[in-house]
UniProtKB/Swiss-Prot annotation:
Keyword Transcription regulation: no
SUPFAM superfamilies cross-referenced by the UniProt entry: TolB, N-terminal domain, Tricorn protease N-terminal domain
GO CC annotation terms, alphabetical: periplasmic space
Stated family: Belongs to the TolB family.
A Pfam family the protein falls into: PD40
Main subcellular localisation: periplasm
GO terms for biological process, alphabetical: cell division; protein import
Protein name: Tol-Pal system protein TolB
Organism: Helicobacter pylori (strain ATCC 700392 / 26695) (Campylobacter pylori)
Length: 417
């Protein structure tokens, strides 16, 4: 048994029906880790790594983190007196004339160096990903619940000017940002096409009709998927990438279509003389949830993947429920609520599951939009706006914790994680 707290995390997780684990903090102290950095070779770069790594470990909720400079030889006796369990030393090394980011992980209890992890410095601005990978190494050493989501890319559409949006990539903290599609057009609604994050779909408004394109990041190539008058948006991709759900409006009113990426065929799966949009896969890709105005206002419905299958209303609370995402049998959605004490309309995130009528509120103020599950369903990212801030939000469902990463000089139209 490495640490009792690890057992507690897994055990409580089995019985916590609403996935809140604040109780852990009162049961067992987290293992203490001291994050250090070396000033050799490139002190500024090492300091950046040190800052991101420390913040990643804090964000994970698995460590009690302290920070320090390199103290030379590891004084295990002194560290034991301080109740420190681990030391993570980040540095920049030079091998064969090339700089590399290096992590050394020391176990104070055993008095030994346990891990050495090298990450090539291909480009200086990629340092957040080096730090995220280091955090994953430290976390995996303790066999804590996975934080592999930290190394995933965010793809987003950013406003440039009237009628112009570019597609860019970022890390989850938004420290790293790089524009990859810039053509003075409206490029919107990006959606990852595969788990490897090598391709994504997006909508481009050209001279005539909106088009759904698939872009390969490595090859910088495009594939034309579909086009439609008025609306053409990919809203969900199946777990194996073989099928996608699209909102198209060839006859004026939008409906949800199922597209087979192998056969290159699309099938209409909703038929209603109103609005059916934003389909997201549910129940291991066997059904979908979607937004419809069948109730006279936007609400969440569910149906199997066939045109003749009936639709079932999932929510009977609220008068405007929209902007959804799903993971297995869980659905996160945006609910428009009454004006708050400041006269502002509030848009909050709520979480439901198909096997429970319980609605879990995830936010309490401001405008919270575009919720997106992580690939393991344990976390949600979203855009938060208040009079005081504009930020990318992160909710750790297992720990009932949230974080905000300020969005400076960037306005996001849509994103995927």
């Amino acid at each position: 048994m490495r640490y009792l707290w690890l057992f507690l995390i897994h055990t409580i997780g089995l019985f916590a029906t609403d996935k809140t684990l604040d109780i852990i903090k009162t049961i067992q102290k987290l293992p203490k880790i001291e994050v250090r950095y070396s000033i050799d070779n490139d002190a500024n770069y090492a300091l950046k790594l040190h800052e991101v790594l420390a913040n990643d470990l804090k964000t994970s909720q698995h460590f009690d983190v302290s920070q320090n400079k390199d103290q030379g030889a590891i004084n295990y006796a002194e560290l034991k007196d301080k109740k420190v369990h681990l030391v993570a030393l980040v540095s920049v090394a030079v091998e064969n004339g090339n700089k590399i980011s290096r992590l050394k992980l020391y176990d104070v209890d055993t008095g030994t160096l346990k891990k050495t992890f090298d990450y090539p410095i291909v480009s200086l601005d990629l340092y957040p990903f080096a730090a995220h990978n280091m955090a994953i190494v430290v976390n995996d050493y303790l066999k804590a619940p996975s934080i592999a989501w930290m190394k995933r890319l965010i793809v987003f559409s950013k406003y440039i000017g009237p009628g112009i949006t570019n597609i860019a990539l970022a890390d989850y903290t938004m420290r790293y940002q790089k524009e990859i599609i810039k053509n003075n057009r409206l490029n919107i609604f990006p959606k990852w096409a595969n788990a490897e994050q090598t391709e994504f779909y997006y909508t481009q408004y050209g001279e005539r009709t909106p088009m759904i394109l698939k872009y390969n990041i490595q090859k910088a190539t495009h594939e034309n998927i579909a086009s439609s008058q008025g609306m053409a948006v990919v809203s969900s991709v199946s777990s194996d990438g073989s099928k996608i759900l699209m909102s198209l409006a060839p006859d004026g009113q939008p409906d949800v279509y199922l597209y087979d990426t192998h056969k290159k065929t699309k099938t209409k799966i909703t038929r209603y003389p109103g609005i059916d949009v934003s389909g997201v896969f549910l129940e291991d890709d066997k059904s979908m949830a979607f937004v419809s105005d069948r109730s006279g206002y936007p609400n969440i419905y569910m149906k199997k993947l066939g045109l003749k299958e009936s639709a079932e209303q999932l929510l009977y609370e609220g008068r405007s429920n929209e902007s959804i995402d799903a993971y297995k049998d869980s659905i996160v959605y945006v609910s428009r609520e009454n004006l708050n004490e400041f006269g502002k309309t509030v848009f909050n995130l709520n979480l439901i599951t198909l096997n429970s009528k319980y609605i879990r509120r995830l936010t309490v103020n401001g405008s919270n939009q575009m919720p997106r599950f992580s690939t393991d369903g344990r976390n949600i990212m979203y855009i938060k706006k208040t009079p005081q801030e504009y930020a990318m939000g992160l909710i750790l469902l297992d720990y009932n914790q949230s974080f905000l990463f300020p969005l400076k000089n960037v306005k996001i139209q849509a994103f995927d994680w």
